[in-house]
Amino acid sequence: MVFTKEIDLGQGKVLKIETGKMAKQADGSAVVSLEETMVLATVVSKKDAPPANQNFFPLQVEYREKYSAAGKFPGGFIKREGRPSDKEILSARLIDRALRPLFPDGYYQETQIIVTVISSDQLNDADVLGGIAASCALMASDIPFENPMSEVRVGRINGDFLIFPHVQELEESDMDICIGGTADTICMLEGEMSEISEAEMIGAIKFGHDVIRKICEAQRELREVVGKPKRVFEPTIIPDDMKAAIREVAEARLKELAYQPLKKEERADKTAEVYADASAAVLRKYKAEITDEILAENPEKAIYLNEKAINDYIHDIEKHVMREMILADAKRLDGRRLDEIRPISIELGLIPRAHGSALFTRGETQALVTLTLGTKKDAQLTDTLFDDADKRFMLHYNFPPFSVGEVGRMGSVSRREIGHGNLAERAIKKVVPAENAFPYTMRVVSDILESNGSSSMASVCGGTLAAMDGGVPIKSPVAGIAMGLIKEGERYAVLSDILGNEDHLGDMDFKVAGTIDGITACQMDIKIDGLDYAIVEKALEQARQGRMHILKIMDEAITSPRQELAKYAPRLTTIQIPVDAIGAVIGKGGETIRALTSETNTEIDIADDGTVTIASVSSEGSAAAVDAIKLLVSDPEVGMVYNGKVKEVRDDLGAIVEILPGVTGLLHISELSHQRGTKPSDILKVGQKTKVKLIRMAKDPKDPRRTRYSLSMKVLVEPPAEDGQKENE
């Protein structure tokens, strides 16, 4: 049965949901359309029982943008889509993070969601539509997913909020926020802003949530009309007496451990000992009590001998102990207050050859961040369904396994690394100077050397410091902080600068970055239902206070960007040439510009409007390139010296020398040298470069439209002294 529903979102936007027409062999499928952008989402979940020792939910979300959706061919030699782009990976993460917490606890069936953009009007970004389509597919399926989720994008122009703004409108908007949530609560938030206030952020979330409720209501209607009966799902239930036995051997030790302010590695080792000892003790107890005969007659008692179930409940105890310590005693694992920031240390300029560098350490999280400056040629070309563009500021984040004391694969960039780098990049790019003020391409690389929570926000701080150390005239320093939440019923605590364990065992990971004037980027993931706006407001205010504290420490390390670029950074010089002279500078097949860059040891970039950017580590090379280019685009002038190229050599006449592109002159045999009898072929070869001076210009008597140019080499050298003069000397 085909189900179709149109939802009036206001502002002339109508969202269309359809299911039952495409991909009917999947467990669930749906098509969501906005104007002429359409996405197809499918979901399939395995029905086989997961392995007995599995304790995680293997959810895979894939997002693909088909070039055919926009009537385009893929770029490059191979004309078909290949590995996912960064944009596709970021969109998949956006959908995954909103959906994952809404699956029931203990559901461990391998599940795959594939979102495909099948039509793009190049006005609407399909990422949030993919989230809606995925939720619709789940609601129509038999998979135990009961609470619909919707995602929306919110922008703002001239103070007015926009729902699902066009890509072109986002260029004028002072915010680009993606919000994911159910009808009752917000579960995901991500976006970039132009230094907005906390109150403005709350206003945007509330505006988006009103639209989310409408879309969720339509999904419930879809479920009632065409939804399949849900699978029977029974999570593992541990008997009360088994829970008591586990608590008896584990709870006291875990509580004692929680109140000790230990380093990450030491805490992990001691916690692992508790798990091993407690699990072994419980297994010994029940193996002695439950014989094979008893187990054969009572197969339900197998749970008592299930080591995975035992460890899962020990984990629940560990989680409860930490949360209760925070809620009851306002005490954290490392002994800090709820709003206290870990100690921060900063070192600048420690990498000699980098154009800017910073080592930012906050507690047990450390980022080594470097800045590299380049020319427009170094910009990243992004090939998407929308217009291709050059990206002149980029931040790359690396998370090697040694940063958490592990051995791991060193291969391609992970989705997590792409996501964290993108968040840090969005946080800083709002303060990056415009191209006309600072015509460099900037690449910031954050290598995480240690990690115990909030490494992406350390990358924001380190990236800002490296940029300032490198002399990038940013508008204002940016700092980032990760906030956490512990909530039990009506009791809750908001945590500043969370540890890895507080993220893992807590209910929220809310990263907020910004300047002294406002927020520039945020990312929030919620693991619980029922998060009200009072908690979000408290988290944002506490994050603001933490951000001010971090910015103060950063200001003590470096107050403003350095006035000069680093020793090894390229110096950029910009000049303007006539558009019709661009060909003269480039030369046939690029030979002129290649020769220029080689001779002056520079990089030269020419824009379509005639803007020439010259990059050189030395001012001498840059000046030489400027002089050469100005000469190339100027008209021939008597008295000027040119670095000409010999085009023809004739012993009876002299040589024909090209002094400017398409301009040749005669170097007469009499102007070669002060020495008589010199043969041109003895000192000149075709293709040779030689300095000549233009000594005369005259109209060609045979063709007045042409000009004859007379050149000289000998006037550039001193004539030899006479014999009498030599003797007197």
Curated annotation (Swiss-Prot):
Cellular compartments per GO CC: cytosol
Subcellular location(s) per record: Cytoplasm
Any one of the GO BP annotations: mRNA catabolic process
Record InterPro entries: ExoRNase_PH_dom1, ExoRNase_PH_dom2, ExoRNase_PH_dom2_sf, KH_dom, KH_dom_type_1, KH_dom_type_1_sf, NA-bd_OB-fold, PNPase
Cofactor list: Mg(2+)
Pfam families linked: KH_1, PNPase, RNase_PH, RNase_PH_C, S1
Residues reported in the UniProt entry to bind Mg(2+): 503, 509
Matches recorded under SMART domains: KH, S1
Chief place where the protein resides: cytoplasm
Enzyme class: transferase
S1 motif domain ranges (all copies): 639-714
Function: Involved in mRNA degradation. Catalyzes the phosphorolysis of single-stranded polyribonucleotides processively in the 3'- to 5'-direction.
NCBIfam families noted in UniProt: polynuc_phos, PRK11824.1
The protein, known as: Polyribonucleotide nucleotidyltransferase
